[in-house]
Amino acid sequence: MVARNLYELLEHAALDPQDNKISVYNPGNVDQVGKSLTYADLLNTAKTNALLLPQVKGIRPDSVILLHFDNHFDAIVWFWSVIAAGYVPAISTPFTNDPEGRKKHLIHLKTLLKDPVIITQESLAKAFSIVDGLNTHTIESIQKFDAPHILNGVHATAKQHDDLAVLMLTSGSSGNAKAVCLRHGQLLQSIAGKSTHHGISKSDVFLNWIGLDHVANLTETHLQAMQHAAPQFHVQASDLLVDPLILLKLIDRHRITVTFAPNFFIASVRVALEHPEPFLHGKEPDLTCFRIMISGGEANVVEASQALTTLFQKYGVSSEFIRPGFGMTETCAGSIYSRECPSYDVSNKWEFASLGTCIPGLQMRISSDSGEILSMNQVGNLELFGPILFHEYYNNPVATAEAFTADHWFRTGDHASIDGNGRLSLAGRAKETIIVNGVKYFPHELETAIEDALIPGLTPSYTVVFPHRPKNSQTEAVCVVYLPSYEPEDVLARVGVADAISKISIMQTGVKPFQIIPLDKTLLPKSSLGKLSRAKTRAAFEAGKYEVFQKLNDDAIHAYRATQNQAPSNETEATILHVFADLFEIPEADIGVNTSLFEMGVSSIEIIKFKQRIQTELKLKVEIPVITMLTNPTIRGLAGTLETLMGPQVYSPKVTLQAEGKKTPLWLVHPGVGEVLVFLNLAKFIVDRPIHALRARGFDGEPFFEDIAEVVSTYHQAIKEEQPEGPYAIAGYSYGSMLAFEVSKVLEANGDKVEFLGVFNLPPHIKFRMRQLDWVEVLLNLSYFLDLMTEEEAHRISPEMHELSNSLGNDKVLDYILERAPRERMHEMALDRKKMSTWADLAYRMQAIAQDYDPSGRVRNMDIFYAIPLVAVAKSKKEWVDNHLVKWRGFVDEEPHWHEVDGAHYTMLGPDNIHTFQKTLRASLEERGL
């Protein structure tokens, strides 16, 4: 029987006698499957959850359900739960790192999806709090509902071919996401067409590592496997990207026949296999089962495909297996594939692989800009037609109209040609995007971030970011050109701008730019509207018109770095330098111990790789915290810190978050939890001055501070040792504001000038709040400060935790929290039970020594940054300012400068608000003459 809709597809799979499973690996563990369920199990679970969904507050029969998860298992279960209940799921894409973009994205989705019901997990719910009025619910809260005996509302089995099945989001990293309407019949025809094209049957076994928010998972793997009731395995992308050889081990272990891999990952697997003895510490994989590797998202390099095919043949693959394809969300993922890679491409001597022919249900053509249909081998606009195509963008008639020609063919936005054998080849994209390692970025977002950084030496409004694919490269690269404001011979300024742009690019895209070129103003002409042409800039670069400027810049920076490079002075430095050179594939002679990770263009994946390699090479018995890598980016700095880690711990409060820049250093004092991690995001944006943070004593077994006087004395001494002379700039976050105030008084009493004293959302009188915080409350505050739970959850369980503490002790409270904490977050923070317990004790001690604190004395000036207050202390910003913060006036000679900032007390420095906060902070420093 042929399924009429997705629900029937699952029903049919559940009846299959082989009882095959969907198996999911937990994040961080690829040694054994974490969770699995048969198709029958999935159907039963979905039906059970479907009984609960109509009870969700605000849900309507026509509601869109926006699903947001960070793991495969929950995403799959709740996707089918929504389908079973008869609603339309919209699968949320991962949030961007750009706070402003993320907020804009959520506000846009609220309108686009007509006030959707949002379902997520408790550990992710906090991300939605930045936008008012969102109807957000957690799966943990929904599962506590009482289930009725019958399901009211729309029955999933009643859905027809033309009914809307799911909404998939496109361009999720910008504020103009579109929701693609995928229909039941469209999806079913698509997976049938894929299977026919590739010869897939129920004997196949699927492996996926892409999120369900991407059609490369939903249709290419999940639904296609379900169509055949075939086994499917899901692993986290982060686990494969750290060690690409895990792919081969999983293929061997589960006898995988079908998987997906973009070109950048093919290149990573190739590099790993070309290492001498890649499986030195384990058995070689048996790949005789493997036959299909779907590849899409970016152009496939023929040379890399040929190399990987040869390498896989050593492990038993008998034929060509890479299937380069073309697809979009609008076409249910891949819809045009080559089955002759690399042989067809090698015979034609092509650099990039052909994309082959259409699957059943799709036609393609090439047209000119005027609408003329072009003949073979002519480059033009790729257009598609057929029943597997979408019909519309949800709630967006303008975009829908623009997407189709007058005769209803879909405009893909790609330039392409079709050869004499009917094979498709892409020639580029009409749309302005950059695809780096399979991930799409928008040039204007990186341009904005660079401009907002106010980099010394860079002229505002003359920065252009564009994509470029270097010859033989496996992926596109980022290029940046700018107008310098420094003199050509000012090498320090030249290097400073390059490093600042690199740092911002790494933060935004995860990679260092391929080229950063300062240009003459004559090469950056603006239109009558004051715009720079990205297309013309890219064309000029690729035509070689910037080569003179590029060579001059590269030579100057290379010569400067060569004079600055220093040789290793001990074995630890030499080992780290060797790992550094090997990982980034650069000669050891070209780097020194003062070379920074940020100069190399690190991504988070490469930081983890670097960390793991160092731990192995140095045979470390302790885990290197990620913060250690981020705050000690040079080889010498990291070596010194690691030697400290390996030897007796000597406490120093100073943690340098940013060492570069000539402006007055900024000192940041920790909040009540004692740690300085909260300042990392802020330090990324400030490239023109050193940033030092002050960290509490006791994290590494030292005695906790006895009183505030000892804290102030210790921090004052640390500041004077690093910066003997003023002027000084000091700021504190929350509890740290009190300490910054006290340190400033000591500095001024000794004749030093404190030109800037920043108070981040703290009033002068705090002892009443300090007395409210017992150990349990401190632990709960710490837990949501570390994103181990949401603030709402901490408040909700507080009474229960206090009862648990009173009856069984604090250890049981800690057990409760750690059992429910996200594993990935614990691993990222290098947290274990002992560290968490110590941290809670330290934070409680910091609160305790302030229980009798009364402010006294005066400082010359103060800048007060205020956000939404804690519910426990004030009901509104107005009440917070008028009744609490205003009392600082009694302790300052001049009227304080007031700065209203976005977010709430615990989120004002978070990723969602840091972009606007840093602008306000930098402007206030400038206003104070710093």
From Swiss-Prot:
<dbReference type="InterPro" id="IPR045851">
    <property type="entry name" value="AMP-bd_C_sf"/>
</dbReference>
<dbReference type="GO" id="GO:0031957">
    <property type="term" value="F:very long-chain fatty acid-CoA ligase activity"/>
</dbReference>
<dbReference type="InterPro" id="IPR001031">
    <property type="entry name" value="Thioesterase"/>
</dbReference>
<dbReference type="Pfam" id="PF00501">
    <property type="entry name" value="AMP-binding"/>
</dbReference>
<comment type="pathway">
    <text>Secondary metabolite biosynthesis.</text>
</comment>
<comment type="similarity">
    <text>Belongs to the NRP synthetase family.</text>
</comment>
<feature type="region of interest" description="Thioesterase (TE) domain">
    <location>
        <begin position="665"/>
        <end position="914"/>
    </location>
</feature>
<keyword id="KW-0597">Phosphoprotein</keyword>
<dbReference type="InterPro" id="IPR036736">
    <property type="entry name" value="ACP-like_sf"/>
</dbReference>
<dbReference type="InterPro" id="IPR029058">
    <property type="entry name" value="AB_hydrolase_fold"/>
</dbReference>
<dbReference type="GO" id="GO:0016740">
    <property type="term" value="F:transferase activity"/>
</dbReference>
<dbReference type="Pfam" id="PF00975">
    <property type="entry name" value="Thioesterase"/>
</dbReference>
<feature type="modified residue" description="O-(pantetheine 4'-phosphoryl)serine">
    <location>
        <position position="604"/>
    </location>
</feature>
<keyword id="KW-0596">Phosphopantetheine</keyword>
<protein>
    <recommendedName>
        <fullName>Nonribosomal peptide synthetase acyN</fullName>
        <ecNumber>2.3.1.-</ecNumber>
    </recommendedName>
</protein>
<feature type="region of interest" description="Adenylation (A) domain">
    <location>
        <begin position="15"/>
        <end position="436"/>
    </location>
</feature>
<dbReference type="GO" id="GO:0006633">
    <property type="term" value="P:fatty acid biosynthetic process"/>
</dbReference>
<comment type="function">
    <text>Nonribosomal peptide synthetase that mediates the biosynthesis of polyporic acid via the condensation of 2 phenylpyruvate units. Polyporic acid is further hydroxylaed by the cytochrome P450 monooxygenase MO6277 into less toxic ascocorynin.</text>
</comment>
<dbReference type="InterPro" id="IPR009081">
    <property type="entry name" value="PP-bd_ACP"/>
</dbReference>
<dbReference type="InterPro" id="IPR020806">
    <property type="entry name" value="PKS_PP-bd"/>
</dbReference>
<dbReference type="InterPro" id="IPR020845">
    <property type="entry name" value="AMP-binding_CS"/>
</dbReference>
<feature type="domain" description="Carrier">
    <location>
        <begin position="567"/>
        <end position="646"/>
    </location>
</feature>
<dbReference type="InterPro" id="IPR042099">
    <property type="entry name" value="ANL_N_sf"/>
</dbReference>
<keyword id="KW-0808">Transferase</keyword>
<dbReference type="InterPro" id="IPR000873">
    <property type="entry name" value="AMP-dep_synth/lig_dom"/>
</dbReference>
<dbReference type="Pfam" id="PF00550">
    <property type="entry name" value="PP-binding"/>
</dbReference>
<dbReference type="GO" id="GO:0031177">
    <property type="term" value="F:phosphopantetheine binding"/>
</dbReference>
